[in-house]
């Protein structure tokens, strides 16, 4: 990981390249999930409503369930951005999300899916940087590096929570609510 956590300019660039606009958030979340489903179609099985849509010949990406899931994912990213000046608050929050994903192992969630989620975040966030014409080329490239590190940070702590959860370990037994 780069040194963005200790660099005020990088933190400012991170916030500058983030938007809480509903449509932008939905588009980002959709891009993340569509990337995941294209890379690992079996991940669709984690969401029972997808097979229902597909059996009916409907596009699951147009359904309310997909929209809600896409927004749920980007809310986590948004929470990280809002707390970028207080990173110590985030570890338990992300770890807890990983712990909760243990319940999806019965639906086919596998530890290697975390890597696909990380790749999807990195790809979608990198593509999003191209929608910022106000950034210099250097700032755009730096933002891509910072967002890559954010994706790594998020997944690293979620994966740790998930792996510990599989072993019955919880380093943060009091649920972190932020």
PLM region spans:
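Globin-like tetrapyrrole-binding proteins
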Residues: 1-178
